[in-house]
């Protein structure tokens, strides 16, 4: 089995923490030197509880000697793991709506502080929903009426999410976008895979295997629609939180379902359309929601050669379990 890159993602924001302490940490927190011509090896951002430092940018030079600092980081250049693609935040419908309520001047200032690699924190990744999420105005997909001929980007995307993404990319064109659906269109759902009774609900259900290829083409249409707006989609996952039955918009997709969808629907649809967007599997918690038959979800899919050829890695959330699971998956 080929090792896969592991991509960790969290719904909401990624937190960047540089320093913390007790209530008197303004007296004890080490103060980094201000950037100098010699201190260019590392850029650090410092925040303390007294807010005397609030993501304050500073520079640091590598050294070979020992020191008494309690926050020393020791690097071994001979040992290398995966490359870090970046850090970022979720751009949901509600996030985009709230940003659009700001004045253009204030919004540009905020987005520059967040995404600019020259004048801000340099966030380099954003996560968005394919269709609705649990931070949307309501539940919807891009094709609520049966048949892909009815596919269209929803108002939440065209009026809020896409304009915000364009402003972000104007500030930092290198920002990467990863996306996931919270649910497939309801007309693609069944209550169970055994009986395949139609399931007219935004919450839970399964993707009807009869629609695996159709749903793969749905992804292609969505990616192409965003590309027409000048927004390249770096990666997708087949399903946000696939083991979560209870979200406002959700779809249960066990590892066997994900495997079969990828190798017979999503992967072939991408290949036929020439879509270069990466596919990450899983996109849920380290503990697999304590479902014994779903443990090691990604590696079970990797073991299938037909599915694995389309997969770039795995995505994880930090809501449950221990991040040491990433080491197990990497092995």
Walk through the language-model features, giving the residues of each.
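N-terminal zymogen propeptides
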Residues: 36-65
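N-terminal catalytic cores of secreted or lumenal carbohydrate-active enzymes
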Residues: 55-233, 264
């Amino acid at each position: 089995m080929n090792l896969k890159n592991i991509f960790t993602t969290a719904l909401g924001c990624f937190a960047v923490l540089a320093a913390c302490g007790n209530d008197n940490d303004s007296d004890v927190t080490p103060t980094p030197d201000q950037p100098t011509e010699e201190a260019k090896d590392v850029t650090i951002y410092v925040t303390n509880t007294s807010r005397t430092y609030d993501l304050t940018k500073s520079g640091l030079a590598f050294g070979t000697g020992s020191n008494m600092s309690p926050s020393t980081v020791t690097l071994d250049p001979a040992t290398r793991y995966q490359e870090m693609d970046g850090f970022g935040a979720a751009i949901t419908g509600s996030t985009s709506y709230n940003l659009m309520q700001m004045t253009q001047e204030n919004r540009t200032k905020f987005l520059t502080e967040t995404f600019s690699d020259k004048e801000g924190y340099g966030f380099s990744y954003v996560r968005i929903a394919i269709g609705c999420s649990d931070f949307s105005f309501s539940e919807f997909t891009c094709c609520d009426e049966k048949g892909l001929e009815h596919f269209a980007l929803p108002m939440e995307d065209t009026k809020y999410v896409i304009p915000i993404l364009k402003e972000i990319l104007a500030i930092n064109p290198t920002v990467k976008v990863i996306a996931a659906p919270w649910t497939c269109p309801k007309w693609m759902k069944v209550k169970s895979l055994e009986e395949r009774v139609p399931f007219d609900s935004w919450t839970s259900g399964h993707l009807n295997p009869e629609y695996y290829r159709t749903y793969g083409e749905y992804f292609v249409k969505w990616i192409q629609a965003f590309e027409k707006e000048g927004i390249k989609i770096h990666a997708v996952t087949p399903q946000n939180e696939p083991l979560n039955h209870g979200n406002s918009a959700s779809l249960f997709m066990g590892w066997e379902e994900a495997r079969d969808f990828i190798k017979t629907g999503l992967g072939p649809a991408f290949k036929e359309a020439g879509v270069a967007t990466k596919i990450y599997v899983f996109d849920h918690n380290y503990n697999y929601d304590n479902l014994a038959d779903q443990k090691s979800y990604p590696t079970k899919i990797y073991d299938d050669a037909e599915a694995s050829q389309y997969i770039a890695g795995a995505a994880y959330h930090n809501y449950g379990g221990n991040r040491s699971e990433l080491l197990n998956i990497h092995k």
